[in-house]
């Protein structure tokens, strides 16, 4: 009933490893919902938890246990250890590396369409851009961010392997990552469309479509945020703060429901995104 020839061809062409941060207590709820929905369309998925001696021995190959303490204060260490592991074991097998939370929903076909306009052999960093803490800003961790193969290689070899070069624990993980990427000359690239609409959402779809404006979003967003029908790109890529039941509903609406007589125009979306590097901020970001 659905002609998905174009999307299937694209899905095979671009290889993405997805890594999802979670905790043991939500493996059977949030992580399971991710695994049963959008993660099925990743080329490889790893669910990352902090190692805990009290946990049973891991027999599932899609669960990565990293040796860091549990808790939000150690999310930077969790990210650093995960990226080192992925670099050492999977770097040449995949083109792009997506980080998401266990309450993030990703429309993989739309992400791969965006990535088809970029070259994974160049140092590229993508996501929802906030305008604080560095010359270019940083990508929201909850909306999901993406590194090219070249970016990951540079991050680990020129950043994490040099003692003291990059923060490896404490602070906000998404900010720490942005600082390290900037220090090794990995470039921020655009994910907004030609109408100025976002494709990665740091808040829930309800917040962006219905409002009110999430607190602080106008102050923090690199691009002018919009609430309502013009909030988000037609080829939306991610939602944040998605509960497991709504994740299943999104999956059904996107992949099991159609509107009769409506068909996307390939020509109309071919040049939808503003592709290219993002310019540095014209003022000193607050720290």
Each language-model region and where it sits:
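Secretory-pathway lumenal glyco-enzymes, predominantly type II signal-anchor Golgi glycosyltransferases
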Residues: 1-287
